[in-house]
């Protein structure tokens, strides 16, 4: 528990103090967010607001994770693990993609940033590397960071995406990992359209997973094989990483809350999406994450529905997509939408954690 608290605190401090440095840097160089003319008129006032604040979030996560594990190694109570490093690598890889996108927008005056092909290839390569590596590095018990089984609260034994390790099965698994990584990174990116919305929602999700992975650590099958135990390779280190994600997003949210002094940009949203995706895979809770991260699911689903219906029927389901803009178009104030969506996110988190804990109670009583 001490490691988790240290990680969250360090991440928060790094993020909350580094963010204003970035605000001053980008403001002095007159580098800010461009706002589309065809968008909501109320958002035009945000033109010129500094972006790329995700740098502070990533820095907070990295510094906290590294510092906490070095401290743990000195104290002889833990250290870096393969699972944590792989998720961190996924986060950094997608963060680098987002950074390139933001850099092109700001410094090369190309408002669309990376072209779709470059972004797709980058996400695909990062996801495939992550998907391959999470099946490597077995521990002394033969447990790898992830398995080819689909997972809800733990692996679902009857659904093996790897088809017993066949070449076809591994390809199917890698495709699945790409879908997971792409979906979550784009979902967080799409949600980042209102002041504080993506940062706040991610903080709720990371808070939930800090508890979930710590509970997996306390009830690990490595220490005692009993009803309700969890076969997760490195749950404590994952909890440390989740706490870093929680602290970093809260520190950034201090400056990103309405009216935002800075936006996280693709640098932050893609990185946080990678963190969400990676944690769901290595904690073996891919389907549970759909409940806990339901607001992200709603946001990306609204875009898919809008595009699908418009292309097939020539009609729009929402006034604007993603759905948070729909409510703004109805006349809701931006802060009203953000806070109500936070409430939805909190309810989703509570529901997901409740399902997780109820499962353990049920198995523990059997």
From Swiss-Prot:
Q: What class of enzyme is it?
A: transferase
Cellular component aspect of the GO annotation: plasma membrane
Q: PROSITE patterns annotated for this entry? A: MRAY_1, MRAY_2
| Any GO MF annotation of the entry | metal ion binding
The reactions it catalyses are: UDP-N-acetyl-alpha-D-muramoyl-L-alanyl-gamma-D-glutamyl-meso-2,6-diaminopimeloyl-D-alanyl-D-alanine + di-trans,octa-cis-undecaprenyl phosphate = di-trans,octa-cis-undecaprenyl diphospho-N-acetyl-alpha-D-muramoyl-L-alanyl-D-glutamyl-meso-2,6-diaminopimeloyl-D-alanyl-D-alanine + UMP
Pfam families according to UniProt: Glycos_transf_4 (PF00953), MraY_sig1 (PF10555)
Query: What cofactors does this protein use?
Result: Mg(2+)
Which Gene Ontology BP annotations are present? cell division; cell wall organization; peptidoglycan biosynthetic process; regulation of cell shape
**What broad class describes the main subcellular location of this protein?**
membrane
Question: Where are its TM segments located?
Answer: 3-23, 54-74, 76-96, 118-138, 161-181, 197-217, 238-258, 262-282, 287-307, 341-361
Pathway listed: Cell wall biogenesis; peptidoglycan biosynthesis
Q: Where in the cell is it found?
A: Cell membrane
Q: Tell me what topology the record assigns in the membrane.
A: Multi-pass membrane protein
| EC number of this enzyme | 2.7.8.13
Q: Does the keyword Lipoprotein apply?
A: no
**Would you identify the family this protein belongs to, as annotated?**
Belongs to the glycosyltransferase 4 family. MraY subfamily.
Supply the PANTHER family for this chain: PHOSPHO-N-ACETYLMURAMOYL-PENTAPEPTIDE-TRANSFERASE, PHOSPHO-N-ACETYLMURAMOYL-PENTAPEPTIDE-TRANSFERASE HOMOLOG
Function noted in UniProt: Catalyzes the initial step of the lipid cycle reactions in the biosynthesis of the cell wall peptidoglycan: transfers peptidoglycan precursor phospho-MurNAc-pentapeptide from UDP-MurNAc-pentapeptide onto the lipid carrier undecaprenyl phosphate, yielding undecaprenyl-pyrophosphoryl-MurNAc-pentapeptide, known as lipid I.
- The name this protein carries in UniProt is Phospho-N-acetylmuramoyl-pentapeptide-transferase
């Amino acid at each position: 528990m001490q490691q988790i608290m240290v990680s969250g605190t360090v991440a928060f401090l790094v993020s909350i103090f580094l963010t204003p440095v970035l605000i001053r840097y980008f403001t002095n160089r007159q580098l800010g967010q461009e706002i589309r003319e065809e968008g909501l008129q109320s958002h035009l006032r945000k033109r010129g607001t500094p972006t790329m604040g995700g740098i502070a979030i990533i820095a907070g996560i990295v510094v906290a994770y590294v510092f906490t594990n070095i401290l743990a190694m000195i104290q002889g109570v833990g250290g870096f693990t393969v699972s944590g490093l792989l998720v961190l690598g996924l986060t950094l890889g997608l963060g680098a993609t987002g950074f390139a996108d933001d850099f092109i927008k700001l410094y090369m005056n190309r408002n669309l940033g990376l072209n779709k092909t470059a972004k797709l290839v980058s996400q695909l390569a990062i996801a495939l590397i992550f998907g391959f590596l999470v099946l490597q590095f077995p521990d002394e018990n033969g447990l790898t960071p992830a398995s080819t089984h689909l997972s809800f609260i733990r692996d679902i034994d009857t659904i093996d995406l790897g088809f017993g390790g066949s070449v076809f099965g591994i390809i199917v698994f890698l495709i699945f990992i790409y879908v997971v990584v792409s979906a979550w990174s784009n979902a967080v990116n799409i949600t980042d359209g209102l002041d504080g919305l993506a940062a706040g929602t991610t903080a709720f999700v990371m808070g939930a997973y800090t508890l979930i992975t710590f509970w997996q650590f306390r009830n690990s099958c490595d220490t005692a094989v009993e009803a309700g135990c969890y076969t997760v390779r490195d749950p404590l280190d994952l909890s440390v990483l989740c706490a870093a994600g929680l602290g970093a997003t809260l520190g950034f949210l201090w400056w990103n809350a309405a009216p935002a002094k800075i936006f996280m940009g693709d640098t932050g949203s893609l990185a946080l999406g990678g963190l969400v995706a990676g944690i769901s895979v290595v904690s073996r809770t891919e389907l549970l994450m759909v409940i806990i991260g339901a607001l992200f699911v709603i946001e990306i689903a609204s875009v898919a529905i809008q595009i699908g219906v418009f292309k097939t029927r020539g009609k729009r389901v929402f006034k604007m997509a993603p759905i948070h803009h729909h409510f703004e178009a109805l006349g809701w104030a931006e802060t009203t939408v953000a806070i109500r969506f936070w409430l939805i996110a909190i309810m989703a988190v509570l529901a997901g954690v409740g399902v997780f804990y109820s499962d353990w109670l049920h198995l523990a009583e059997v």
